[in-house]
Each structure stands twice: as structure tokens, then as C-alpha cells.
């Protein structure tokens, strides 16, 4: 247990931030998984693009709040975009 008032406050603040960061990260990961699941189930292009936009938004919100680093956000969006683009390209060719 902290002895100083400022140390007690740091414990409160860090616990509050931990819970918020966990919520941002969980939301982001669930939306990414939804996109990947839609690709695996061969859903329509419109549906995948809608899920992809929501995933991008969740990733950006997590980065904006500081839950993840901006470079990690960029990397996650880029890798997800590559997978979506590959699927949509294959779908156009009728594979």
C-alpha cells in the first residue's frame, strides 16, 4: 500500500487507465477477428469492406487514446488491408 497521497492517486489513475486500455484493445482485436472470419467464410465484398472500416476505426481509436503505439496501429491496419485486398482481388478473378 502506498504511504503518500500522490502514490495512492497514481494507483487509482493507473488502474482506471488499465481498464480503459483493455477495453480499447479488446474491441480492436474483436473487430480484426471479425474481418478475418468474414474472409474465411467468403462473405460479400461489401460486408467485408464495412467490417474493415470498423476495424480501422477501432485501431485508430486505440492509438489515439494511447492504448497502442501509433506505429503498431499503422502496422495492424496495413497487414489487415493486405489480406482484404488479396481476398477482394481473388474474388474478382473468380477464384
From Swiss-Prot:
GO biological processes: translation
Primary gene name: rpsT
UniProt-listed InterPro entries: Ribosomal_bS20, Ribosomal_bS20_sf
Short name of one Pfam family: Ribosomal_S20p
GO cellular component, one term: small ribosomal subunit
Protein name (record): Small ribosomal subunit protein bS20
A GO term for molecular function: small ribosomal subunit rRNA binding
Domain of life: Bacteria
Record key words, sorted: Ribonucleoprotein, Ribosomal protein, RNA-binding, rRNA-binding
Purpose of the protein: Binds directly to 16S ribosomal RNA.
Homology family: Belongs to the bacterial ribosomal protein bS20 family.
Amino acid at each position: 500500500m502506498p504511504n503518500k497521497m500522490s502514490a495512492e492517486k497514481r494507483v487509482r489513475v493507473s488502474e482506471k487507465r488499465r481498464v480503459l486500455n483493455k477495453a480499447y484493445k479488446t474491441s480492436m482485436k474483436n473487430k480484426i477477428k471479425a474481418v478475418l472470419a468474414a474472409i474465411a467464410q467468403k462473405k460479400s465484398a461489401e460486408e467485408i469492406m464495412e467490417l474493415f472500416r470498423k476495424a480501422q476505426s477501432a485501431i485508430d481509436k486505440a492509438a489515439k487514446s494511447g492504448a497502442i503505439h501509433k506505429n503498431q496501429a499503422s502496422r495492424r491496419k496495413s497487414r489487415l488491408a493486405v489480406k482484404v485486398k488479396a481476398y477482394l482481388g481473388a474474388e474478382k478473378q473468380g477464384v
